[in-house]
UniProtKB/Swiss-Prot annotation:
Entry's Gene Ontology BP terms: arginine catabolic process; regulation of DNA-templated transcription
Modification(s) after translation: Phosphorylated by AruS.
Protein name: Transcriptional regulatory protein AruR
Pathway(s): Amino-acid degradation; L-arginine degradation [regulation]
One GO location term (cellular component): cytosol
Localization (cell): Cytoplasm
Lineage of producing organism: Bacteria, Pseudomonadati, Pseudomonadota, Gammaproteobacteria, Pseudomonadales
PANTHER family linked: REGULATOR OF RPOS, TORCAD OPERON TRANSCRIPTIONAL REGULATORY PROTEIN TORR
Domain of life of the native organism: Bacteria
Species, as recorded: Pseudomonas aeruginosa (strain ATCC 15692 / DSM 22644 / CIP 104116 / JCM 14847 / LMG 12228 / 1C / PRS 101 / PAO1)
């Protein structure tokens, strides 16, 4: 029997917390709630300690004290938990920054419960699939340029042995580039390969993911050496990969 998905709702509005807890609970989720970042961090730590980790965080951007963007950035440094941001209709810049910080997706207030559940299901399924795919049969280490990719742990390792955690989206994007090294991939092709969310024609998330991956690869966006922008066509990954 599949494990019941555990979701943490982080919002300072008790009405929204109660609404999401009730709706997601009816859909079969184990729902926890927090009113601010500190409560959320304590809840995540306790669940991890009990061996019952949270798989998805629904996180309001505009929290009192430590805001949702800061919490997203801190969580992504140490965790691969799925993160869906809850944003206002006029928070377009914050949504882009949130994706750059490591969020996987976002929903816009006023919330559409059916859309929220659909996005939650898709993200949890992707997180679980990624976790299940990490096994002994995989080619765990791949070398490209000056980097090693530890696929089992989704870590980049530089020549000095320093490790950098990749988010699911970054890992999928890098995988698509490694499989197609030397070939230009359009945004549509990348969207099809990483299947990160239900993409919209105007969605900038591919560009955001590329920017995040470039930073982690220390690839200067002004003069990139690994991920080249081919204007009007897409992106070209220049480094060939081999088993380490």
């Amino acid at each position: 029997m599949a494990m019941v998905p555990r979701v943490l709702v982080v919002d300072d509005d008790p009405v929204i917390r109660e609404l999401l807890q009730a709706y997601l609970g009816e859909e079969g989720y184990d729902v926890l709630c927090a009113g601010n970042a500190e409560q959320a961090e304590a809840c995540l730590a306790e669940c991890a300690h009990l061996g019952q980790p949270v798989e998805l965080v629904l996180l309001d951007i505009r929290l009192p004290g430590k805001d949702g963007l800061t919490l997203t950035r801190e969580l992504r440094v140490r965790s691969e938990v799925g993160i869906i941001l809850i944003t206002g209709r006029n928070d377009e810049i914050d949504r882009i920054v949130g994706l750059e910080c490591g969020a996987d997706d976002y929903v816009i207030k006023p919330l559409n419960p059916r859309e929220l559940v659909s996005r939650a299901k898709n993200l949890i399924r992707r997180v679980r699939h990624a976790q299940a795919s990490a096994g002994p049969a995989r080619q765990a280490l791949r070398q490209f340029g000056d980097w090693l990719l530890d696929a089992d742990r989704r870590r980049l390792i530089d020549h000095a042995g320093n490790e950098t955690l990749l988010t699911h989206g970054e890992f999928q994007l890098l995988g698509a580039f490694l499989r197609n090294s030397g070939h230009t991939l359009s945004r549509d092709q990348l969207m099809d390969q990483i299947r990160n969310r239900e993409w919209l024609p105007s969605d900038r998330s591919i560009d955001v993911l590329v920017g995040r991956l470039r930073r982690k690869l220390r690839d200067d966006p002004a003069e990139p050496q690994l991920i080249i922008t081919i204007h009007g066509a897409g992106y070209l990954f220049t480094a060939a990969a081999s088993d380490a």
